Amino acid sequence: MSIINRAFFISIFLLFSADVFAQNPKIDIVKFYEPLIFQKDLARNSYLKKYLKQDFSVVWNYHKNDESLGFIGEHYQRIRIKILSAVKDKNKLQTYIVNGKSAVDNEIKPFQGTFTIRQIKILTDMRWGVDDEYKNKGIKAQGVLIGEYKLYQDRNFENSGFFEGLLSALWYITDAGEIKFDNIEFESDSYRNNQFVGTWTSYDRTKKIKSNWGDYRIPDSGNLDIGAGEFSPNKKYLKNGWESYSKNLHQIANDVFN
């Protein structure tokens, strides 16, 4: 491929990628953090260029031994998502190579794919936690990263497909320049992190259904979550995989991934 053609191809690819992000169904993913964070709490400008060289993989690797809460389909069937590793791509600084597993009931499927950061927003007013616990802990800034994900299940498994959509995560950076998973407001009833909003599509393209997940709360989950202080599944959906969760909240003894 000539240098001119290669440059043209790269330009088209970047334009297409940006267009896909812009046209993704107009979802304000920040709204899923309300009332923890509101859009008005964030600086208008994106700080992507400023933080591009930082490694944000910690926000996805923080819960390596745990699973996210999630659902798939209109009847809120429980799906478990476990990120085993997220590694920053040295050549594409916005991209992270991801490996993990998904499970519906006891059917476990490995997946791999990418997280791509598109925007980085900074909080205009810092949050310090209960009784300002973190106020003097050397925190330089707090923010939200927003991006896209594409995760491909192993094709060797029956009824496999791929997940795609928008992602977001709360983070903070220390005075020493370290990126951290933001759990400062963990004691808040509205706390959540790592919100994923999107779809699952079968490889044969016969099915495309809604599938969302997150840490501690699930974004855009309708009447599934009826909990006040923490996530609690609606009794209406217990038969869709949530009965074991309601009996053993943290799923330590019955972790299907072990």
Predicted features along the sequence, with ranges:
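Short, linear, compositionally biased motifs with a strong N-terminal bias
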Residues: F13-L14
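Bacterial N-terminal signal peptides that target proteins for export
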Residues: M1-F9
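Central antiparallel beta-sheet cores of small beta-barrel/beta-sandwich binding domains
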Residues: I27-G222, I226-N258
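N-terminal signal peptide c-region/cleavage motif recognized by signal peptidases
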Residues: S17-A18
